[in-house]
Amino acid sequence: MIAIIAEKPSLARNIVAGIGEMKKKNGYFENSEYIVTWAFGHLFSLCDIEDYSPLPSESRKWTLDNLPCFPDKFRFRLKKDDKGKEDDGVKKQFETIKALLNRKDVDKIVNAGDSDREGEIIVRLCVNNALSENKPFYRLWLPDQTPQTVSKALSEMKEEKEYENLANEGFSRTYIDWLYGVNLTRYASIKTGTLLRVGRVIIPIVKAIYDRDLEIENFKPEIYYALVSKAKTNGEVIELTSKYKFSAAEKAKAERCCERMNVFEAVVTDKKSKKEILFPGKLYSLTKLQNFLGKKYKMPMEKSLSIVQKLYENGYVSYPRTNSEYLATNEKDKVKQIISGVKKLGYPVVFKDKKTIFDDSKIESHSALTPTYKIPDKGSLNDDEFTVYSAILRRFVAIFCEEECYIEKSELTISLGGKEDYSIKGSIILTEGWTKYDGGEKKDKMLPKLEKGDKVNVDFHPEEKQTQPPKHYTIETLNNYLKNPFKDDKTSDDNDDEDYKAIFKGLELGTEATRTCIIDNAKKSGYISLKKDVYFIENGGKYLIEQLSDMNISMDKYKTSRLGQALKKVYHGEMTIDESVKMAENEIRQVFETDKNAGSGFYGDVIGKCPKCGKNVARGRYSYACEDFPDKCDFKINLRILGCPVPKEQAAKLLTNGKTDKMNFTSLKTGKVFSSSLKLDESKKVVFDFT
């Protein structure tokens, strides 16, 4: 008997569809050969710091006493619910899995997690915690969830040990993110008195948006003068722009230059045109699909991912969390089958065997997003699902379209007295080809009716212009930045070798599988916002980045990409889990050492007596604190509370009178300014007083 553990119920149902007739039981399916059961995604999570700490387990107060926490061995436990209590559904399903795997008639176990590092460890954790004795262990790897693919994959399963490096990468990622998230979130939150969510990837994402918005805020436009001619020749306005520019103070100089230019004769010195094929874009990776949907339909990333995941689970598209825009050479027969299905929809598609489509060197784990041979019934998709599915289908049709798109490109060269040449380019679509299905609106750009040797009238004059600020990040530009944060914005996308090298080295920030969730968490935490398809930093994000900067906590793209590279080395067997974890621990240790070396020494005069223990209170690095802080006394007043600096005089008044004057604070959630005093409550904590 073969026991298959799927990552989630929907996948289990699709596996059952591929196997054939099975009886539904309580928490699993079964026939004479197979048992198919499932998890609910992660059934296990890493233990909390308190579970490793020598402090009493009943004490759940965050404290610096158990930081930094570097477990000798990471421990997992069954996942709890949102309230931190035992999840009855999780416990029941795991007990079902445990009972099934340990049945005497089960002699083979199959990992049917999603085909990525996360799916790999989700099922491994179930098996590792359930099995009482070892049994043969295999992997079901599904590029899509159609019955035919499931049936084929069941006959081609490899031993689970062949995916050891993938699992190691998954566990390394889990441990490293726990180390950063738990240690630095608690550290920063304790130091500031505000919950700050610090993570390996969320911080560089928020910081990128913070830096860009700060650039825009501080940008001061400068006036300059461009030399522009807009004069009619044969009834058409011919616009020419010189390469020369002049500053605001050089307007007179610009005018004199224009006068000299207008003396010269402008002549068409060359006219050329050529017919060429316009090729479609590549198949979609998840990033490129989200870019398209965000730009055209203003669809947020979490929504597009949720929809494409549902399409995948319904068997309509291939595995969605892919970073490649290419297909594997061993998928050619599968593509021919998809083409047969797409033809029935009336599209003129034919198989094409090209390096621009099939390229194993540009595939890490999963090939590009495509439709499958399973076509959704008319009306079975809602509007948003149809939009996403159509985008994937239309791109596939464009790639394999029988009809080529031919265009005529033309160029005029106009010389101004032999002193400066100007180029005017145009293009005309001769045959639409694939653009009918995936091209959007293509407009002809006609050249002026001029021939070689024709004279062109000119009337150059200085035209006042302003330098432009950087643009806010959009879904597309932020995604592109995260995919390759070291790529020059101006670098052409025509040659994607640089991007794939960056991905394979681990230089990207986050992955296709994680970025959407992390960006969504940043929005939910009030750090950033998305308006239409444009990202903005919020007050909570400003506060986060500025506080981390004050504490010398750096999670820039360089540090994050170094950790990403370490994970790739684990995946390729070039680094062990322990080595990657030690690397992260050293980075985190530096934060605490820097703070320790800076000391809790006081930078200012004593401002009063501690209301808890009676010792002196003075200004420290992050707060006005008791001289016994943090070892013997935990009293402190943060130097800045919700964006408001707490002056020394107000802190002294709080100690003396138990209350400050009214001050203005900024809500991290709404961004609105509110007025309140600060007071000490019964436990001598600093709280707001609106009376």
Model-derived segments and their meaning:
Residues 9-16, 33-36, 40, 64, ...:
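Amphipathic alpha-helical transducer elements in NTP-driven molecular machines
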